Amino acid sequence: MTRAKSGKISKNRHKKILKLAKGYRGRASTCFRVAIEKVEKGLQYAYRDRRNRKRDFRGLWIQRINAAVREHGLVYSQFMGALKKAEIDIDRKVLAELAVNNNEEFASIVEQAKAHI
């Protein structure tokens, strides 16, 4: 029985890692042993930051809603409580979009919420 060598398999594995490491600085883009560490760390950062992005955007939406609501004499927590009492189910992403782009529609939502404070 002949010996099974893994030349093609390891070549493809190296090629895959080096392709992922394209654009890295120094030996991280050319040397397999360095590249594999950098690619693994990069994938860890990507995984972590996909979750952090959700957190960051929620904070951004809250800041935008708070700024827009303060122009109408309310604060964010009062506004969100009033929306719940008024049974208006609009998520923060849509509210922030309305606050930035459609002031008239946002103002009407604020007036409806003010009626339930």
UniProtKB/Swiss-Prot annotation:
InterPro entries from the UniProt entry: Ribosomal_bL20, RIBOSOMAL_L20_CS, Ribosomal_protein_bL20_C
Encoding gene, per UniProt annotation: rplT
Name recorded for this polypeptide: Large ribosomal subunit protein bL20
A GO molecular-function descriptor: structural constituent of ribosome
Alphabetical list of NCBIfam families matching this protein: rplT_bact (TIGR01032)
PROSITE patterns membership: RIBOSOMAL_L20
The family this protein is said to belong to: Belongs to the bacterial ribosomal protein bL20 family.
Protein keywords: Ribonucleoprotein, Ribosomal protein, RNA-binding, rRNA-binding
Biological process terms in GO annotation: ribosomal large subunit assembly; translation
Reported function: Binds directly to 23S ribosomal RNA and is necessary for the in vitro assembly process of the 50S ribosomal subunit. It is not involved in the protein synthesizing functions of that subunit.
Organism superkingdom: Bacteria
One Gene Ontology CC term in the entry: ribosome
